[in-house]
Each structure stands twice: as C-alpha cells, then as structure tokens.
Amino acid sequence: MVYISNGQVLDSRSQSPWRLSLITDFFWGIAEFVVLFFKTLLQQDVKKGRGYRNSSDSRYDDGRGPPGNPPRRMGRISHLHGPSPPPMAGGUGR
C-alpha cells in the first residue's frame, strides 16, 4: 500500500512487517487494554463521578431503605375466586 510520510510517497512493501515500532505499539496496546479492563472491573462507580445517576441509585440515599409491606387486611378474602367458567359448547343434547 502506498502512503505519504514527511511529504514523500512511500511503499509499505519496502519496510519489514515486523519493524520495532509495530512490535512496541502492539505491546502498549495490549498493556492499555489489560489496565482498562481491570479498572472497569474494580471501579464500579465510574458513572457517579461524572454526574450520571441511575434512577434506582437515588431513591433511598438517606438510609431509610425501601418502604415496608402494607398492613394485612383482616376478614374474608373474596378476590381469590376467578370468573365463572364459560358455558359448555355444543348444546345438541347428545
């Protein structure tokens, strides 16, 4: 492939594919990937420092915790019965 460097047109076939700068660039690319991978694993509060807030993060920040269960109702439970079944189909009397 032809490219321009310092105002000169150069052909990439004239350079070795294993030149030192390519090897060092590859090494530093791998090193930066590993560092960023472990930073994101260990640092879970990246978004909080930048002003982003999740709606679930801001609900109970004062230590109250979520609300408790509503009080139990006493008396007969009448809402457990479902609707009545539909009538039988056919109706021919066989």
From Swiss-Prot:
Region (Disordered) residue ranges read: 47-94
A GO biological process of this protein is:
calcium ion transport
Q: Where are the transmembrane segments?
A: 20-42
The UniProt site entry described as Cleavage is assigned to H81, G82
Location comes to: Endoplasmic reticulum membrane; Cell membrane
Q: What is the recorded post-translational modification?
A: Cleaved by CAPN2/m-calpain in resting macrophages but not in activated macrophages. Macrophage activation up-regulates expression of the calpain inhibitor CAST/calpastatin, resulting in inhibition of CAPN2 activity.
GO cellular component annotations, sorted alphabetically? Answer: endoplasmic reticulum; endoplasmic reticulum membrane; Golgi apparatus; plasma membrane
Give the keywords, sorted.
Answer: Calcium, Calcium transport, Cell membrane, Endoplasmic reticulum, Ion transport, Membrane, Selenocysteine, Transmembrane, Transmembrane helix, Transport, Ubl conjugation
What is the membrane topology listed in the Swiss-Prot or TrEMBL record?
A: Single-pass membrane protein
InterPro entries tied to this protein: Se_SelK/SelG
Q: What protein family does this chain belong to?
A: Belongs to the selenoprotein K family.
Q: How does it assemble?
A: Interacts with DERL1, DERL2, DERL3 and SELENOS. The SELENOK-SELENOS complex interacts with VCP. Interacts with ZDHHC6.
> What's this protein's function?
Required for Ca(2+) flux in immune cells and plays a role in T-cell proliferation and in T-cell and neutrophil migration. Involved in endoplasmic reticulum-associated degradation (ERAD) of soluble glycosylated proteins. Required for palmitoylation and cell surface expression of CD36 and involved in macrophage uptake of low-density lipoprotein and in foam cell formation. Together with ZDHHC6, required for palmitoylation of ITPR1 in immune cells, leading to regulate ITPR1 stability and function. Plays a role in protection of cells from ER stress-induced apoptosis.
Output this protein's name. Selenoprotein K
Source organism per entry reads: Chinchilla lanigera (Long-tailed chinchilla)
Q: What is the lineage of its organism?
A: Eukaryota, Metazoa, Chordata, Craniata, Vertebrata
